[in-house]
Amino acid sequence: MAYENIILEKEEKLAVLYINRPKAMNALNKDTLLEIKDAVTAVNDDPAVELLIITGSGDKSFVAGADIAFMQNLSAMEAREFGALGQKVFRLIEAMEKPVIAAVNGFALGGGCELAMCCDFRIAASNAKFGQPEVGLGITPGFGGTQRLPRLVGPGMAKQLLYTADVINADEAFRIGLVNKVVQPEELLPEVKKIAGRILSKGQLAVRLSKAAANEGMQTDIDRAMSIEADAFGLCFATQDQKEGMTAFLEKRKANFISK
């Protein structure tokens, strides 16, 4: 698929997906969502890539939201279908086997905040802005904001942000737990790639099983969640990576993981 609204770059075991609609502040329309879906599927299916970073082109906007010009004249049925598409694409990102990090540069509003939230975690530039401003447009969030925001920052803070349409800066996003770290804009991608490097130096089968256990466990009761973790723990002991990791530890050397 030829991309017009995104850029997908690969650097050894790492892929970087840029939302690339600078004239529209990287806003999301239907075509952009379909391109993201294609790229994410390709990354997940590529055995050479083990981690994905999602960011926005330029330094002003991660994703400014869903494209209001595109949405303005949608019928109720068309709007529901557009929301369902966004939910499906973001759920695909969330459910990827491989780790996904959001490198948030500039505005992450509405659909942009929702895109960041479906990633495993978020690192923000100091100029980043977050919010779900939809009620100010007479609509609700449509790409998962009412569901993921309470899970990340708690229901009280989430409802305040949802009801007021307040936009918060990167430091406040860090304070409430929406982002893991705030860095200067010029340090954003280098810092995220540094974190990615630390992840990639570990056993990737174990990383993926850890992600799956965490994601699945949050959707069920604690007893079922513990069983999911036990299954993941047991599976690790059928891998070459477990044998290599423990042998390397005992021999006081760096492990050479092969994802098998």
UniProtKB/Swiss-Prot annotation:
Active-site residues per Swiss-Prot or TrEMBL entry: 114, 134
GO terms under biological process: butyrate metabolic process; fatty acid beta-oxidation
Localization (cell): Cytoplasm
Organism of this sequence: Syntrophomonas wolfei subsp. wolfei (strain DSM 2245B / Goettingen)
Protein name: Crotonyl-CoA hydratase
Pathway: Lipid metabolism; butanoate metabolism
Gene Ontology molecular function terms on file: crotonyl-CoA hydratase activity
Domain of life assignment: Bacteria
Alphabetized PROSITE patterns for the sequence: ENOYL_COA_HYDRATASE (PS00166)
Catalysis: reaction(s): 3-hydroxybutanoyl-CoA = (2E)-butenoyl-CoA + H2O; a short-chain (3S)-3-hydroxyacyl-CoA = a short-chain (2E)-enoyl-CoA + H2O
Main location: cytoplasm
Leader peptide range in chain numbering: none
Induction summary: Highly expressed during syntrophic growth with butyrate (at protein level). Seems to be constitutively expressed.
